[in-house]
From Swiss-Prot:
Belongs to the type-2 OGG1 family. This is 8-oxoguanine DNA glycosylase/AP lyase. The record marks 226 as: Important for guanine/8-oxoguanine distinction. GO terms for molecular function: class I DNA-(apurinic or apyrimidinic site) endonuclease activity; hydrolase activity, hydrolyzing N-glycosyl compounds. It comes from Aquifex aeolicus (strain VF5). It comes from the Bacteria. GO terms for biological process: base-excision repair. It catalyses: 2'-deoxyribonucleotide-(2'-deoxyribose 5'-phosphate)-2'-deoxyribonucleotide-DNA = a 3'-end 2'-deoxyribonucleotide-(2,3-dehydro-2,3-deoxyribose 5'-phosphate)-DNA + a 5'-end 5'-phospho-2'-deoxyribonucleoside-DNA + H(+).
């Protein structure tokens, strides 16, 4: 089955959950907070703010969305903003995160950059410009642990719809469908190639990249998460 047919086949099954998630993302970007409800895929719902979403994207890199969601639900905005590095590390270990110390350190470091990042998001409307600034090591906005994928993930989750999140599920789907050459790792060059392939697919399906990501994630995992 080609990519277009496969996505079209599952749209009726999960469209209401994808639409709900996109609304939750847009509210987070617009109002600075949102209420996420992951049922029926995970029996979890909670309020989230911008910094806790940034922290979620730091946590999920080379980990899983499910684990990130559980930790985010447990800590809330206040926990991510106020707990010490040691306290965060203890929570991450308790939940079984493989990189507990490293992620705690990165989240504490990100607090210093956050006011600057927040003002960048408010004034700059071009998502690709913001992504570059969040991922570029020479940028004053650089978040440690963010490359294109993590920056795109954060921006999609706060309402920017035109960026692709090339994680292992998405890259595998593209390679299986012959839309991306077989690669062992996702370099920035490969990332942009994959994003281009997804842009064409999204256009044919009449979807945004943000929506398409959720549909492909569902094809691969049977869950609509984030």
């Amino acid at each position: 089955m080609d990519a277009i047919q496969e996505v079209k086949r599952i749209i009726p099954e999960v469209q209401k959950y994808v639409n709900q998630r996109m609304e939750e993302f847009e509210r987070l970007g617009r109002e600075g907070w949102t209420h996420f409800d992951f049922r029926p895929f995970l029996d979890i719902d909670y309020d989230a703010g911008l910094f806790s979403e940034l922290s979620f994207c730091i946590l999920t890199a080379n980990s899983s969305a499910t684990l990130g969601i559980k930790i985010q639900a447990h800590l809330g905005e206040e926990g991510f903003l106020n707990k010490t590095k040691e306290e965060l590390e203890e929570v991450f270990r308790k939940f079984g995160h493989r990189y507990a110390g490293q992620r705690a350190e990165r989240i504490v470091e990100a607090r210093e950059k956050f006011p600057k990042v927040k003002s960048l998001i408010e004034k700059e409307k071009n998502s690709k410009v913001i992504r570059e600034l969040l991922a570029d090591p020479k940028s004053p906005y650089k978040i440690k642990g963010f490359g294109y994928k993590e920056a795109s993930h954060f921006l999609r989750n706060i309402g920017f719809k035109d960026l692709a999140i090339i994680d292992r599920h998405i890259s595998r789907f593209l390679m299986e469908k012959g839309l991306l050459r077989q690669v062992k790792s996702i370099t920035p060059k490969v990332y942009l190639e994959a994003e281009k392939a997804l842009e064409s697919l999204a256009k044919e399906l009449g979807l945004s990249l943000g929506e398409l990501d959720l549909y492909i994630f569902y094809i691969k995992t049977k869950k609509v998460l984030k």
